[in-house]
Structures are given as C-alpha cells and as structure tokens.
Amino acid sequence: EDVEALAAVEDEDEDARKAAQVKARAVWCRTMARLSMLRDQPHDFKVAVIDTVDALEAGCHAYCCIRDKQDRIGAPTKLYGYGEGYKIAVDEWRNFEALCQALKRRRGMTVVLVSHSTALKVKDATMADHEKQGMKLHKLAAEFLCDQADAVFYCHKDHLIWTDGDGERARMKIQQKPRTLCQTRLGDGWEAKNRLFLPDPLPVFSFAGYQEAAREGLKIRDRVFAHLDTLDPAERFAAELRLDACGWAVGEAAAIVGDANITAPVGATATETTNENKEIST
C-alpha cells in the first residue's frame, strides 16, 4: 500500500496526483515517527532497514510540497525557484539522517538504506565522459546520503566478458554468474565507499558477514588513527592521502602502521583489483 501511494505521486491527473501526495506524505511521516519511536522508547532491535529509500523520496517531496503549498517539488514558483525545491527537500533528508545517527549513537543500532541503482552521467577532466551506477535519487539527496553514510556498497551479479570472433565479426559477449558481488570502493562504473578496510569486492554479501567484518575493520581503523595521532601534520596529511587514494585498503593500513600482522577482516577475505587492474592478495 505504501509503495503504491509513493509511486502514484507521478500520476498525470491532477486530482489523482494531489490525493497521492497526501498518502505519500503520510508514508514519510509514519517513517519518521517509527524512527523516532526506535530512538526514544526501549526495545531490543539492532537493525533498522529502509527498503527502498528511492521510493521513500516521493514521500519526502510530497511532505515538502504540502507543507509549503507547492504543486510539484521541481516546479519553479516564487517560493521554489528553479531547482530550489530539491534543495529544500535535502533539509528534510537531514532530519531523517539525524534520526538514523541517533539510532546509531544512542541505541547502538545499524541503519541500512536500500536503493535501486541508476546510470549517472559523469564528466571528469581526467578521463572521457562516462556513466556509473549510483543511487536512484535526486542528485542532491544522493550526494548528501552517500556523504553521511559510513559505507556505501554497490551489489551486482558477477559476470564473464569475452570477445567472440575476429575482425569485423568480433562481438563482445557477457555471461552472468549466479553469485552476487558487493563493491566496497569507488570504481569507474559505480559509486561505493567504506572506511572499514574491507576488501573490494566482497565475494558474497550477507549482512551477518558484513557486521563481523565491520567489527574487525573498526579495530583496524582505531589502530590506524592511533598511529596517525603520533605523526606531525605534514606526515599525517600524506598518510591520509595514501589511504584515500587506495580506497582504505588493508595493505596500506599495514604499511602506514608498520605492522605486517594487520590483515583483512575475518570473513571478508577476497582478491582485490586495484585501479591499475592488478590483483593483490589480502
């Protein structure tokens, strides 16, 4: 019922769309109320999952439009200048994210936001224009939520790519494998990140496996930052640049701390592919 209400916001019929806005706004309000309840009332829950956050975006937009007496979030008006509605919506996402952070800090909960992906056009001065997979949200909302998240993963089916034939008859073929890979670091074709020293990709994604690996990764991160605190500002800046450049690879952490015993988090060992398409063992 909630999903249908959120989807109907795009209805072309004005009366139907306004009725759908009211229902979609109610979905947003219920979601915020439930997160507030988890924050304020005693309970034993350890994980909260929003599935999907791109569907919930319609509720956020409907909430803003009804509150501000606007027709559409993207329609230019005296209050909502061109594109301003989406900026106003980000303020509501900030309230949403503040509740998620409160669950993490006050209740020790993990909050998981699930989103469909979509192809995003990327203009980069260092390479040709290309597309990558990112969250199926408005650009401003996606950037905000990705910035605030501890980890952003892109999951997709593993596949083989090969060329069949020669010359003009050559054709690229793709065979999909049954297993799902979980990309944990930024790639040319997807948006992802983590600061938990996870290998990229995770060979099989499971939430239990991630939690175990994350706990080990946090221990590694604590050791790295304890070491960084002993460095002078110039050395620390250089070390942080090295970490960012390698996507927080565990091998770089071992090199910075000077401890070869630092290894990949338990349950998350995999073969990593660097930006130079070389394989390193973790």
Question: What positions do the PLM features span?
Answer:
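Interfaces that engage single-stranded nucleic acids at replication/repair/recombination sites
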Residues: 1-43, 182, 190-282
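Conserved GTP-binding G-domain of TRAFAC-class P-loop NTPases and closely related GTPase folds
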Residues: 120-226
